[in-house]
Amino acid sequence: MNAELLISLVPQTVAWSAKTSSIMILCNVLCIVSARYIIQNKNKGTALPLSGSFSTFGLPELLATTSLGHIIGSGTILGFSYIGLLS
């Protein structure tokens, strides 16, 4: 197919701004905090130098939660831009 045709079919997304970055950060923080209560087998891999209630959080848990946070954040940003909340 023609490349121009394919490019014209892709919807225009919002530019990266403070609003979009704050949504992404919020989604990542929510996933990390919720994982504290959801993950049952913690600290199975390399430990992270964290203190407090996240001291049992390891590298696998951090990578998993931030990956999920980016997926949820991307969907949230695309959804908000589609309905017009982000411009």
From Swiss-Prot:
This is Photosystem I reaction center subunit PsaK. It comes from Guillardia theta (Cryptophyte). It is a multi-pass membrane protein. GO terms for biological process: photosynthesis. NCBIfam families: PS_I_psaK (TIGR03049). GO terms for cellular component: chloroplast thylakoid membrane; photosystem I. Belongs to the PsaG/PsaK family. It is found in: Plastid, Chloroplast thylakoid membrane. It holds the Pfam family PSI_PSAK. Keywords: Chloroplast, Membrane, Photosynthesis, Photosystem I, Plastid, Thylakoid, Transmembrane, Transmembrane helix. Its main location: plastid. PROSITE patterns: PHOTOSYSTEM_I_PSAGK. The chain crosses the membrane at residues 13-33, 62-80. The keyword Methyltransferase does not apply. InterPro entries: PSI_centre_PsaK_sf, PSI_PsaG/PsaK, PSI_PsaK, PSI_PsaK_bact.
